[in-house]
A protein has these predicted regions:
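Nucleotide/pyrophosphate-binding catalytic subdomain
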Residues: 1-201
Length: 201
C-alpha cells in the first residue's frame, strides 16, 4: 500500500534496552499520527499542511507513548516529557526540567522526551528566538531532535550521548552532499557541540 505501518520491531528492541538512568529522546509522532489517522479514516487529512502536521503530531504522540509502554520492562515507569525551545532558553524552566530528569532514576522511571510539535508554532518560535538574539543572548533553537538530545545531554551532564540516525553524517552545506562530514569529535560534549555549530555556520 501507499502508506506503511510503524516498525514495531525497532521500537520493541529499543524499548527493551531502556533502564532507569537512561534518557530517551524520541521522534516520529507526526509520521505515526499520519499513519494512525489514515488507518482509521482511509485517507490523509486535507487542507493546510502546517495545521495537518500539528494534528498528526497530537494524534501520534499518544500512539508513540502507548507503544513504548507496551515494550518497556513493566518494572519501570515511563514518563512523557514534551519540550519546546523556551525550556532551554529560560533559566527557571531549564532548572525545573533538569531537576525532574535527575529524579527519574531514583524513582525507577525512564523519561521519554519529544519536541512538542502539536502546539509549537514555527512563526512564534522564530520571533522568540530572534528576540533572544537581539538582546545579545545565545538562543537554543531546537531545530530537530538531535539538537534537543544534545541539549538534554548537556543539561543532565550525561556521560554518553548516542544519536541513532539513518544519515551518514553532518552536511556543512545542506545543499551540497559532497560537504558530508562523517566524524566530529571533542574532549567533552560542550566542545563537541561547539564544533558542530562551527560546521553549520
Amino acid at each position: 500500500t501507499e502508506y506503511s505501518d510503524m516498525n514495531y520491531n525497532v521500537i520493541a528492541r529499543i524499548s527493551r534496552e531502556l533502564r532507569p538512568g537512561y534518557v530517551w529522546v524520541t521522534s516520529g509522532a507526526t509520521e505515526i499520527g499520519k499513519l494512525d489517522y489514515i488507518k482509521r479514516n482511509g485517507k490523509p487529512l486535507e487542507g493546510d499542511e502546517e495545521e495537518n502536521k500539528t494534528d498528526y503530531a497530537a494524534q501520534g504522540q499518544s500512539v508513540l507513548m502507548q507503544t513504548y509502554r507496551q515494550f518497556v520492562d513493566s518494572r519501570y515507569s515511563v514518563r512523557q516529557i514534551l519540550v519546546e525551545h523556551q525550556h532551554f532558553n529560560d533559566a527557571e524552566k531549564r532548572e525545573h526540567l533538569c531537576d525532574m530528569l535527575r529524579r527519574c532514576p531514583k524513582q525507577n522511571a525512564i523519561p521519554i522526551i519529544n519536541y512538542n510539535d502539536a502546539i509549537s508554532c514555527e512563526e512564534n518560535r522564530k520571533l522568540e528566538i530572534n528576540r533572544i538574539k537581539e538582546s545579545g543572548g545565545h538562543a537554543i533553537e531546537c531545530v530537530d531532535n538531535d539538537e534537543t538530545a544534545s541539549q538534554i545531554a548537556c543539561l543532565v551532564k550525561c556521560r554518553t550521548l548516542l544519536i541513532l540516525s539513518t544519515t551518514d553524517g553532518i552536511l556543512s552545506n545542506p545543499e551540497d552532499k559532497a560537504s558530508l562530514v562523517e566524524r566530529v569529535s571533542g574532549k567533552d560534549i560542550y566542545e563537541l557541540l561547539e564544533n558542530v555549530e562551527e560546521l553549520q555556520q
